[in-house]
Structures are given as structure tokens and as C-alpha cells.
Amino acid sequence: MAKLSNEELLDVFKEMTLLELSSFLKEFEETFDVTAAAPVAAAAPAAAGAAAPAAEEQDEFDVVLESAGDKKIQVIKVVREIVSGLGLKEAKELVEGAPKPILEKVDKEKANEAKTKLEESGAKVSLK
């Protein structure tokens, strides 16, 4: 097998969906017995520094699916509608794997719109 350059690897990753990347990351962690989590000691100073800007209004939100509720099929349909390029299988895995982020770093209007649609379909959703 030919060795891929860093640029070629990045091109391959750019073509993958978020779910495919997540699956790859889990497999990579298991294969090499490593974890992608940041050390806790390194994250603590960043959190202290972030407390001051917290007074400003947040302009980027993550839409997190907490639970699909009783109407899982309806929620899957709405997830496919909200997340562009998501196939039925990926949407189903995303819904069944809740709690999981559906959208990341979106503006307030889009986050509220997605939250409303998901809640109308029976899902429990939070904005972070």
C-alpha cells in the first residue's frame, strides 16, 4: 500500500461526513490505544480566561439532541432536513446515539429554528 502524504490524508478527511469522521476516530483510538481528549489540567486555565467574555451575548450555538422521544422516525426525518448531506443511515445513528450535537457553531436564529423543528417532531433538544 502506498504511503499517503499529509495533504492527501487531509483531502480524504475533508470528503468524509461528521459521522464517518467520528467512527474513524473511535476506531483509531481503539486500534492505537490512545484518546483524543484534551488533558484536564490544560483545559482549566482556558475556562478561567473565558469567564470574562461570558458577559457578552453568545453568538454561536451548538444544537444538541438530548433524546428522540417516542416519535423517532419523525425526528430522523427532521434531522435529515436540518443537516445537509446526511443519509438515512447516518441520521438514524445520530438520533439513536443521543445525546449528540446535530449542528455546531451556528447563529442564534438557525439554532432556534432547528430546535423548534426538532421539538415539534417530539425530540428533546438543548442549545449550548
UniProtKB/Swiss-Prot annotation:
Gene3D superfamilies: 3.30.1390.10, Single helix bin (1.20.5.710). It comes from the Bacteria. Signal peptide: none annotated. PANTHER family: 39S RIBOSOMAL PROTEIN L12, LARGE RIBOSOMAL SUBUNIT PROTEIN BL12M. NCBIfam families: L12. Homodimer. Part of the ribosomal stalk of the 50S ribosomal subunit. Forms a multimeric L10(L12)X complex, where L10 forms an elongated spine to which 2 to 4 L12 dimers bind in a sequential fashion. Binds GTP-bound translation factors. This is Large ribosomal subunit protein bL12. It comes from Saccharopolyspora erythraea (strain ATCC 11635 / DSM 40517 / JCM 4748 / NBRC 13426 / NCIMB 8594 / NRRL 2338).
